């Protein structure tokens, strides 16, 4: 009777453990969420809901955290998520219990199907069955029950702990009862005492390890599953009864039905000795199989009821759509979160959520969290807490780099699955050799008469959409729709009106192929469905993709997410020349599996469009779980279809997961449509969060601004010209009505009287506010509203303060601009040079010297123009974007024009275009404009600078010696009122230096000779020049000719040491490719450089007008450019062709205007430019 008693301990075990390997049910899910994420009430409001943050992108194979293993095993760093590994000394108990029961289940199954194994294990099996644990000789059903129990124990299910503990307590009680009854043999007494000791140890361990079994079980449809179990058992009993009647063996007639019931329903736990006789041996396995089949059918029904929990409610979907509208611009897979066969868990703040499915005990998250990236860690914590609550293994499919990093920070590992193909529509084109295959396919499709129609789903009639769905089903090459993380799985839903349908139509007007794409933010689409008729011509898909990309601008689309290519890097690296054996073997293995799963086909079908590849990752907790996560992914994606499974396209969820206040706000819709978030743009939240980090003074000023706005004061009104400038007001009569406007720099408040210092561009003055003179308001109103730096407009009459200071006696005032940031120290101003460059606007507001520099620069530019206009020159504008960089030897900036798909250069000089004008008959021409050179930045160089180039027909370079001197002297006169420039004196202060009169003129070779103390002329040999350079420690390059060496000596020994303005004339011909040779001195060209105080200011040529010689020289330069010299000029055939029409003898001048301003003001280029280039912060 001992065994019979034990046989009743697990009479309903199939109900208890059927959830251990299945999807949890609705009540369990809800309670889990309540325990793991006590949601902060979050309505869709500007203050609590949403904000936007940009994403990041990188390419790496794994994202294991520092100090951790990328594959498996415990990590050395702390686990940041809620699934912290237990630190209890009893943490091993769940696994040990699961392994023990699992071994018994495995041996029981083997014994049930193999007589040999059953014979071999007979003695230990009977001992275990009699004294330790139920272990019948044959029972497939009992093996199935033990397998469920083992899985539940390993998953730390609380109900499994309870049932195992109950079994141990009952078994111990039976042993105690048998010991107390006595009349046992010595062997039985030993077995009973040993069993009792084992049970006591097991009970103590289970009780002590109670907290290690924390996982709950989601509730399923127990009644429905029980009905299926009863029906299956009844059928199994009846069929088994029939079999035992046919093959009774020695089994007595009265024991046949009880024996069958024991084997089918009772798991053969009753002692066989209770029955008279035995049936044929093979029947025991069949009886157990019937019981197992009934259990399996009931479990499947229970699983199916729990899978219904893998579904959204309407409120869930509505909240997800709201998050996507506010934050979904960076996630190409975000819209697939609205797939309705998923569950969702929200972050505590309600600003982020994760959608997931539960398959075979794996909680599989679908890509990145949805919502504010700053709330992603909260969503991941809530999701991991849910996994811990129910004992699920966490897994992620299709995470982006940013998402994978978030999961990694929560304790998961990441592996690169493959890459997503992204088309940038602004860069897409059918031209070029790389697009030849696509171009040919598109041409074939067009020749076949195909056209493309593109529509939003909302623009399609219900009848047409029904036809579209029918075509999609007919052209599907699988029995069911696939997809989980990268597919929507539905068509024709009214909530998907923003989706895009691309159709290929033949000559008869029939649709032969279609693409359906879901929204990706507001400017992108992501491929969801691709179908084509078997009769469609070759190139149909290429035509649809190309037409979509080429017409994207009219649709407001800038990016298209195409298919996902698994293991793309493996295909690419394995095919490279010199790939290693491992890479080639891995690629070969993938090619083998591509026969069934189209791995390579997906890669090549996307690669031909030349997309950007964006990696996607799978995340897992431990390497041992990778196979399990992989199987769960295969099930979720639809590649492995479980019995009775379905893909819900309607809302079948039972309990909304959205926070309570959000659900009660009235913003969410039961049909899943997006809430109205038009007034809740994330920029508001960003502004508020940024404001909380602002300095105190800024927050105070913002508060004042709000007060003014509430009081109806427009702090930024429409402009009205003041009657006077400050300078004019100071000279005006006392009785004259005056209105001035400017910035408040200082305020002195004496109660009823207030003094303020006001500055405009013309100067600075004191304004006086007296309560007795104000027409409206009081001085206190001015103090309450105005801060230093505010722009105000004041009206009144001029007068004097009691101390005799000339002041404007104010009768009325108004604010015209609220300054939200405080000005620098009123006495020192901006002292940091870098700060002055970056915030030039503040520097101008507080620093009179900066204003003087701006004014001086303006006067210099005006003077240069007026001097040239007075000589009969005309000003022109030539292209800044040029196809060939020429006109000077310098490294250019390169850009690209998409329309013509070619590189362009920002001009380094306008020379070649101005000479075209000279050919056309423009005899005196100049251009004053910007030029760009990709070179160093220092006190005298800026990548962007102002350049003057002027050309005068029938002149030479000596004419421009006087012309250049006149330009500079006139500019100095305009800036200072006299022909002087400012230079630092011995004390460091700027002192005026007279530059009037005639300036020195020297040849280059004479100047170099003076510097070396050795005679150098155009005929000096290269070897001699090299020796002189070595002696002077001037470096040179081996391929330089004599002219280049002389130029290097000149730059180091002459130019850098020049003080007074000096013209250095007659440069070597080889370093002057656009200059005519000297008329009387061989080896030199008619060119001069003007140098003053170590800086080259200008250069002038007698221009080379011989087109044959010009071509020869430019060809030499082009050879240097082809050899890798980035500064050498390229061959400009258009320019040479223009020169062949004959250009008159011309003298040309080039002058750096920025350096001219530097010379006149004595400042660096960064000080004289309003906005010089500065390093990024």
UniProtKB/Swiss-Prot annotation:
<dbReference type="GO" id="GO:0005886">
    <property type="term" value="C:plasma membrane"/>
</dbReference>
<feature type="DNA-binding region" description="OB">
    <location>
        <begin position="738"/>
        <end position="816"/>
    </location>
</feature>
<keyword id="KW-0067">ATP-binding</keyword>
<keyword id="KW-0046">Antibiotic resistance</keyword>
<dbReference type="InterPro" id="IPR024320">
    <property type="entry name" value="LPG_synthase_C"/>
</dbReference>
<feature type="transmembrane region" description="Helical">
    <location>
        <begin position="281"/>
        <end position="301"/>
    </location>
</feature>
<dbReference type="InterPro" id="IPR002313">
    <property type="entry name" value="Lys-tRNA-ligase_II"/>
</dbReference>
<feature type="binding site">
    <location>
        <position position="1089"/>
    </location>
    <ligand>
        <name>Mg(2+) 1</name>
    </ligand>
</feature>
<dbReference type="GO" id="GO:0046677">
    <property type="term" value="P:response to antibiotic"/>
</dbReference>
<keyword id="KW-0479">Metal-binding</keyword>
<keyword id="KW-0238">DNA-binding</keyword>
<keyword id="KW-0460">Magnesium</keyword>
<feature type="transmembrane region" description="Helical">
    <location>
        <begin position="135"/>
        <end position="155"/>
    </location>
</feature>
<keyword id="KW-1003">Cell membrane</keyword>
<protein>
    <recommendedName>
        <fullName>Lysylphosphatidylglycerol biosynthesis bifunctional protein LysX</fullName>
        <ecNumber>6.1.1.6</ecNumber>
        <ecNumber>2.3.2.3</ecNumber>
    </recommendedName>
</protein>
<dbReference type="GO" id="GO:0000049">
    <property type="term" value="F:tRNA binding"/>
</dbReference>
<dbReference type="Pfam" id="PF00152">
    <property type="entry name" value="tRNA-synt_2"/>
</dbReference>
<keyword id="KW-0472">Membrane</keyword>
<keyword id="KW-0812">Transmembrane</keyword>
<keyword id="KW-0030">Aminoacyl-tRNA synthetase</keyword>
<feature type="binding site">
    <location>
        <position position="1096"/>
    </location>
    <ligand>
        <name>Mg(2+) 2</name>
    </ligand>
</feature>
<dbReference type="GO" id="GO:0004824">
    <property type="term" value="F:lysine-tRNA ligase activity"/>
</dbReference>
<comment type="function">
    <text>Catalyzes the production of L-lysyl-tRNA(Lys)transfer and the transfer of a lysyl group from L-lysyl-tRNA(Lys) to membrane-bound phosphatidylglycerol (PG), which produces lysylphosphatidylglycerol (LPG), one of the components of the bacterial membrane with a positive net charge. LPG synthesis contributes to the resistance to cationic antimicrobial peptides (CAMPs) and likely protects M.tuberculosis against the CAMPs produced by competiting microorganisms (bacteriocins).</text>
</comment>
<comment type="similarity">
    <text>In the C-terminal section; belongs to the class-II aminoacyl-tRNA synthetase family.</text>
</comment>
<comment type="similarity">
    <text>In the N-terminal section; belongs to the LPG synthetase family.</text>
</comment>
<dbReference type="InterPro" id="IPR004365">
    <property type="entry name" value="NA-bd_OB_tRNA"/>
</dbReference>
<keyword id="KW-0443">Lipid metabolism</keyword>
<dbReference type="GO" id="GO:0005829">
    <property type="term" value="C:cytosol"/>
</dbReference>
<feature type="transmembrane region" description="Helical">
    <location>
        <begin position="159"/>
        <end position="179"/>
    </location>
</feature>
<keyword id="KW-0843">Virulence</keyword>
<dbReference type="InterPro" id="IPR045864">
    <property type="entry name" value="aa-tRNA-synth_II/BPL/LPL"/>
</dbReference>
<dbReference type="GO" id="GO:0003677">
    <property type="term" value="F:DNA binding"/>
</dbReference>
<keyword id="KW-0436">Ligase</keyword>
<dbReference type="GO" id="GO:0050071">
    <property type="term" value="F:phosphatidylglycerol lysyltransferase activity"/>
</dbReference>
<feature type="compositionally biased region" description="Low complexity">
    <location>
        <begin position="65"/>
        <end position="85"/>
    </location>
</feature>
<keyword id="KW-0808">Transferase</keyword>
<feature type="region of interest" description="Disordered">
    <location>
        <begin position="1"/>
        <end position="40"/>
    </location>
</feature>
<dbReference type="Pfam" id="PF01336">
    <property type="entry name" value="tRNA_anti-codon"/>
</dbReference>
<feature type="compositionally biased region" description="Basic and acidic residues">
    <location>
        <begin position="681"/>
        <end position="693"/>
    </location>
</feature>
<dbReference type="GO" id="GO:0006430">
    <property type="term" value="P:lysyl-tRNA aminoacylation"/>
</dbReference>
<feature type="region of interest" description="Phosphatidylglycerol lysyltransferase">
    <location>
        <begin position="1"/>
        <end position="676"/>
    </location>
</feature>
<dbReference type="InterPro" id="IPR012340">
    <property type="entry name" value="NA-bd_OB-fold"/>
</dbReference>
